[in-house]
């Protein structure tokens, strides 16, 4: 192998220039850094990086090529009370690596030591980084750039969406290749969604506890290498290009790709977790630590990345630019996004949030925050700056309570229906900022929401202690999927009422993949470790009628001007009128204490009839000739200026023009 040259400090990671590879690694406290390269026989060669520019250690290896397997050993003080945990016996991954060879297994040699160094060498068992080339023919690929006011998001897991689809070739099911297959593209376009939000596709690791009980981290939130495309979701050997092929196919169909990304914690977990990367490279720069060097745990995952540190912030920004520029993704959903604004308290003016919104290379990206973590002051719904949108748990909970429990007022329902203006408008945000959702990957599916009163998570191996107990669900009289015809009909009506509310609310709707098909997880509301038929969509048993209903709702949404406007609904602007059952404006007492019966007139022509009460009701319609709008059942049309609505039902009428 050629002799190492000085190289350069940027960019971080391993960069192939056609003639060799430049390596650059950040570590402020290290005293010695070794580049470790491995041949086909796992033989290790160590090369000291003698060049240092500021806190960047670097070197250039002439003649090195893509495919080279490598890692680092970093030496320095081991003083846990000072936050220093250097251990040269541990082979470390490059935080900027683009590809991983192998898997992180549960092995004692990966432990770095709690109070003193663990001197067992980890190189033999440790996964290795791989040098990559990033050339790719994007042809004429363009970002769809769907305006927020026209966006409908579909949250899905790559494998869960495609693994059991009978019309996708068996050898690619569950992969990026399946995601980009014409069968899947046709399904998504026929449904009418505009953006596919993928659960993490960053390279993740399975937690030791899960490995010990024979489970896997299915969701992928235990991220190991945020720059690397997860190999476990690839059908072939080239995960990066397979993923890019899928993005290109989705773009060609006008569908945006939004990635769920994890920058709040790492796969190194708590102090008893493995030393794989940041802990051994520069522990006190990468992590939030207490006065005695202990890890803060505002994420519930054992550690918290210190995203206000300049070097760590730069690392995150470089990662976002990689996914935007190299992989052409259209946006990001940030898991536990309060961590992004911690300094350590949350502020909307945090350096990382400011960098994201002002970065020219990220212009046009959709940015979505999950606005909470479990630390002090962690709940920050409505507090993120423009241009962020935010997952609204208030929408989820209030709409569930309205339809399934009847314990919130018409006023609360209307506030959520109107893009939660009470939360977002006061901060000069626009309606799109409210990501309206009924369900998501964490929690009950929609079918389970109307079939189970209690979680059933025993398969997760935690004695049913995991997962929330606050579901606001309603099994309609019988626990579980099996029920008599009357209960099935009431469950179906509840699903349709909830879905209608979701799709026709102002704001940005997000649909969980499978909800339109009647998918159940058998009452498991925390299926993060169930990479099996519990979570995979069963296409052969799909509720086709419900799917057609949802597609019709999305098409209906596109025709209603009030749901396409970018500004807030204002009294007198013609966008919305709120009427009682008699067709008159609601009185203050009716808003807060009235029956759960409401007429919502949108753009003067579409009438959403809401009967969430427990008994049928007759609605006196506004003046005009009204007909049932598709996709609603035309067997119950209005007659004589009245509409007779069943209990806990919803319908949309359209005024006929001359």
Curated annotation (Swiss-Prot):
Pathway: Glycan degradation; glycogen degradation. It comes from the Bacteria. One of its GO terms (biological process) is glycogen catabolic process. SUPFAM superfamilies: (Trans)glycosidases, E set domains, Glycosyl hydrolase domain. GO terms for molecular function: glycogen debranching enzyme activity; hydrolase activity, hydrolyzing O-glycosyl compounds. It catalyses: Hydrolysis of (1->6)-alpha-D-glucosidic linkages to branches with degrees of polymerization of three or four glucose residues in limit dextrin. The record marks 442 as: Transition state stabilizer. InterPro entries: GlgX_C, GlgX_Isoamylase_N_E_set, Glyco_hydro_13_cat_dom, Glyco_hydro_13_N, Glyco_hydro_b, Glycogen_debranch_bac, Glycogen_debranch_GlgX, Glycoside_hydrolase_SF. Keywords: Carbohydrate metabolism, Glycogen metabolism, Glycosidase, Hydrolase. It holds the Pfam family Alpha-amylase. Residues 457-468 have a biased composition (Basic and acidic residues). Gene3D superfamilies: Glycosidases, Golgi alpha-mannosidase II, Immunoglobulins. Its EC number is 3.2.1.196. The active site is at residues 335, 370. Residues 457-481 are annotated as: Disordered. Removes maltotriose and maltotetraose chains that are attached by 1,6-alpha-linkage to the limit dextrin main chain, generating a debranched limit dextrin. Belongs to the glycosyl hydrolase 13 family. This is Glycogen debranching enzyme. It comes from Pectobacterium atrosepticum (strain SCRI 1043 / ATCC BAA-672). The lineage of its organism: Bacteria, Pseudomonadati, Pseudomonadota, Gammaproteobacteria, Enterobacterales. The gene is glgX.
């Amino acid at each position: 192998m050629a002799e190492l040259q000085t190289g350069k400090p940027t960019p971080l990671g391993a960069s192939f220039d056609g003639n060799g590879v430049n390596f650059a690694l950040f570590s402020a406290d290290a005293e010695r850094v070794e580049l470790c390269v491995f041949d086909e026989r796992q033989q290790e060669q160590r090369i000291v990086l003698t060049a240092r520019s500021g806190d960047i250690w670097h070197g250039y290896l002439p003649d090195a090529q893509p495919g080279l397997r490598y890692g680092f050993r970093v030496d320095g003080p081991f003083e846990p009370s000072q936050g220093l945990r250097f251990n040269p016996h541990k082979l470390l991954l490059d935080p900027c690596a683009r590809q991983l060879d192998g898997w992180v297994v549960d092995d004692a040699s990966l432990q770095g030591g709690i109070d003193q160094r663990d001197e067992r060498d980890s190189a033999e068992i440790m996964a290795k980084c791989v040098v990559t080339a990033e050339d790719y023919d994007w042809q004429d690929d363009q970002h769809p750039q769907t305006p927020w006011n026209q966006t409908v998001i579909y949250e899905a897991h790559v494998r869960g969406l495609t693994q059991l689809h009978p019309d996708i070739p068996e050898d690619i099911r569950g992969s990026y290749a399946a995601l980009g297959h014409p069968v899947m593209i046709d399904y998504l376009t026929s449904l009418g969604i505009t953006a596919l939000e993928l659960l993490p596709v960053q390279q993740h690791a399975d937690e030791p506890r899960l490995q010990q009980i024979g489970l896997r981290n299915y969701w992928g939130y235990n991220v190991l290498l945020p720059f690397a495309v997860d190999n476990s979701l690839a059908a072939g050997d080239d995960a990066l290009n397979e993923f890019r092929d899928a993005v290109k196919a989705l773009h060609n169909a006008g569908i945006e790709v939004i990635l769920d990304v994890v920058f709040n914690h790492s796969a190194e977990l708590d102090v008893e977790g493995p030393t794989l990367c940041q802990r051994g490279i520069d522990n006190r720069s990468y992590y939030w630590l207490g006065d005695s060097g202990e890890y803060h745990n505002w994420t519930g995952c054992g550690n918290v990345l210190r995203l206000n540190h300049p070097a760590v912030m730069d690392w995150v920004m470089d990662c976002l630019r990689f996914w935007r520029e190299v992989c052409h993704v259209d946006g990001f959903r940030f898991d536990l996004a309060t961590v992004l604004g911690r300094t350590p308290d949350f502020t909307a003016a945090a350096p990382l949030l400011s960098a994201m919104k002002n970065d020219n290379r990220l212009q046009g990206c959709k940015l979505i925050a999950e606005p909470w973590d479990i630390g002090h002051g962690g709940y920050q719904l409505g507090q993120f700056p423009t241009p962020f949108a935010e997952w609204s748990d208030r929408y989820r909970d209030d709409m569930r309570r309205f339809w399934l429990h009847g314990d919130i007022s018409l006023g609360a329902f209307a506030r959520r229906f109107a893009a939660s203006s009470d939360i977002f408008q006061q901060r000069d945000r626009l309606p799109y900022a409210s990501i309206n959702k009924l369900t998501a990957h964490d929690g009950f599916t929609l079918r389970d929401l109307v079939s189970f009163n209690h979680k059933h998570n025993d398969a997760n191996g935690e004695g049913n202690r995991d997962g929330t107990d606050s579901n606001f669900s309603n099994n309609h009289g019988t626990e579980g999927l099996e029920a008599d015809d009357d209960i099935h009909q009431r469950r179906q009506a509840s699903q349709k009422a909830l879905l209608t509310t979701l799709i026709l609310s102002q704001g940005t709707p997000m649909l969980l993949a499978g909800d339109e098909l009647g998918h159940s997880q058998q009452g498991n509301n925390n299926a993060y470790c169930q990479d099996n038929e519990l979570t995979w969509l069963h296409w052969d048993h799909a509720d086709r009628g419900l799917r057609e209903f949802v597609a019709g709702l999305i098409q209906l949404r596109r025709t209603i001007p009030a749901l396409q406007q970018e500004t807030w609904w204002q009294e007198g602007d013609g966008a919305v009128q709120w009427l009682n059952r008699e067709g008159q404006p609601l009185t203050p007492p009716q808003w807060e204490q009235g029956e759960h019966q409401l007429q919502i007139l949108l753009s003067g022509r579409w009438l959403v009839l809401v009967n969430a009460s427990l008994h049928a009701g007759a609605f006196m319609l506004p003046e005009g000739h009204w007909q049932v709008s598709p996709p609603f059942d035309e067997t119950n049309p209005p007659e004589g200026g009245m509409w007779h609505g069943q209990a806990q039902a919803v319908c949309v009428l359209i005024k006929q023009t001359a």
